[in-house]
């Protein structure tokens, strides 16, 4: 049964499912239906689509080379409901705080919760795309620096997330970094102590020109 799962979903997808669906001190349930659901929602959508969209936009708007420009949302204030409009600060707070949260979960062997923290980072990246709307920024030439900052923030955030993911899904982490740092994937590897820092990526690094699909969506009926 385990070999069948690996043949269909791949080793890292099975790793993710088993680690994520086995709560601390409780029994877990493994089924084809749950595997497909997790594959599609978490791996294909939340993670795979995020990486693909970020690389595609980086290539479309900047030839693959996105840079820090300083055009951030500092001082953006709040909306009519009192919600912060400083999207950059909120994203960076989640990214730089994830390392400590993962450490705390792992100290008590709550592996599923540790992985959930990492995927919360990826979900926040997807929300950041919705908030900043890069496609709209691209239509305004005066917003070019802002667009570059947004895409840089996404690439940097994914880099941190991919490094945190390494112990749980090593092949996936390696594939992500190979796409974000194609000339030298090792450049994307961070020391664990640096995973609460933001902005370590150099400006002159290009992402891959041809992003690969990390996880394909599956149809349960097939």
Set out the residue ranges of the language-model regions:
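Basic, alpha-helical terminal appendages of large translation-related enzymes
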Residues: 79-81, 104, 108-110, 119-222
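Short, charged/polar, low-complexity loop and linker segments
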Residues: 27-32, 96-104
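Short, hydrophobic, well-ordered secondary-structure elements
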Residues: 44, 48-58, 115, 119-122, ...
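Catalytic adenosine-cofactor/nucleotide-binding cores of aminoacyl-tRNA synthetases and other
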Residues: 1-75, 183-206, 210-214, 218
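Conserved, charged catalytic cores of large soluble enzymes
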Residues: 51-102, 126-143
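Secondary-structure capping and boundary motifs in well-ordered enzyme cores
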Residues: 5-9, 35-46, 87-95, 107-117, ...
């Amino acid at each position: 049964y385990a070999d069948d799962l690996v043949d269909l979903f791949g080793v890292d997808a099975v790793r993710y499912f088993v680690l994520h669906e086995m709560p601390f001190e409780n029994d877990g349930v493994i089924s084809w239906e749950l595997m497909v659901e997790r594959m599609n929602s978490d791996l294909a959508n939340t993670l795979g689509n995020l990486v693909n969209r970020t690389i595609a936009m980086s290539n479309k708007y900047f030839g693959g080379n996105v840079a820090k420009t300083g055009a951030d949302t500092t001082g953006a204030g709040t909306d009519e409901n009192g919600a912060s409009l400083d999207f950059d600060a909120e994203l960076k707070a989640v990214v730089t705080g994830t390392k400590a949260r993962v450490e705390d979960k792992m100290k008590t062997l709550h592996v599923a919760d540790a992985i959930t923290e990492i995927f919360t980072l990826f979900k926040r990246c997807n929300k950041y795309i919705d908030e900043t709307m890069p496609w709209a920024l691209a239509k305004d030439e005066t917003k070019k620096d802002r667009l570059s900052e947004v895409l840089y923030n996404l690439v940097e955030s994914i880099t941190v997330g991919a490094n945190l993911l390494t112990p749980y899904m090593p092949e996936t982490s390696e594939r992500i970094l190979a796409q974000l740092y194609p000339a030298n994937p090792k450049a994307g590897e961070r020391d664990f102590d640096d995973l609460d820092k933001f902005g370590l990526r150099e400006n002159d690094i290009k992402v891959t020109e041809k992003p690969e699909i990390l996880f394909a969506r599956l149809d349960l009926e097939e």
